[in-house]
A protein has these predicted regions:
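Short beta-strand segments enriched in hydrophobic/aromatic residues
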Residues: 36, 91-93, 118-119
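Surface-exposed, charged secondary-structure patches
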Residues: 8-12, 41-98
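Short, low-complexity N-terminal intrinsically disordered segments enriched in polar/charged residues
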Residues: 1-30, 34-38
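Short secondary-structure capping/turn micro-motifs that flank functional sites
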Residues: 40-41, 123
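Residue-level detector of alpha-helical recognition elements and their boundaries
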Residues: 28, 35, 46-48, 102, ...
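Short beta-strand edge/turn micro-motifs at domain boundaries
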Residues: 98-124
Length: 124
């Protein structure tokens, strides 16, 4: 029984992550906002500079870069425990760059929300 529950939760988390990816493809942050909690944060390096703060940084970056119609994504790991989860995703060709994202998620009112996104921008 726990395997079935786990699979269902993993599928729900994958759907949340897909909302994020779809927003990257469209280049419209309004399309991805439903994946994130309103108080979510983002952290990672852009070149030598640390970007860290509210998720609005991601929304601004996404809107500024526009559609990433060639974006490819692959979830490599989801780990769930009751109402908390972590996930790792590989993203190729987001504005010509490759990213590795790590998410922490929390199940709130029956829905999985990304609370934190930590990213690695691969060297060109």
């Amino acid at each position: 029984m726990s395997c079935v529950v786990q699979t269902t939760e993993e599928e729900a988390i994958a759907k949340t992550i897909q909302v994020y990816v779809d927003g990257g493809i469209s280049g419209r942050s309004d399309d991805m906002k439903h994946a994130f909690h309103k108080d979510a944060t983002i952290s990672g390096y852009v070149g030598p500079d640390l970007l860290s703060g509210p998720i609005q940084h991601l929304y601004d970056w996404n809107n500024g870069n526009g559609p990433a119609t060639s974006l490819q994504s692959r979830i490599t790991n989801i780990d769930v425990y009751e109402t908390i989860a972590t996930a790792r995703i590989e993203l190729d060709n987001w504005t010509g760059r490759k990213f590795t994202d790590m998410f922490t998620l929390l199940k709130i009112d029956g829905q999985w929300k990304i609370m934190s996104k930590v990213f690695y921008m691969h060297a060109e």
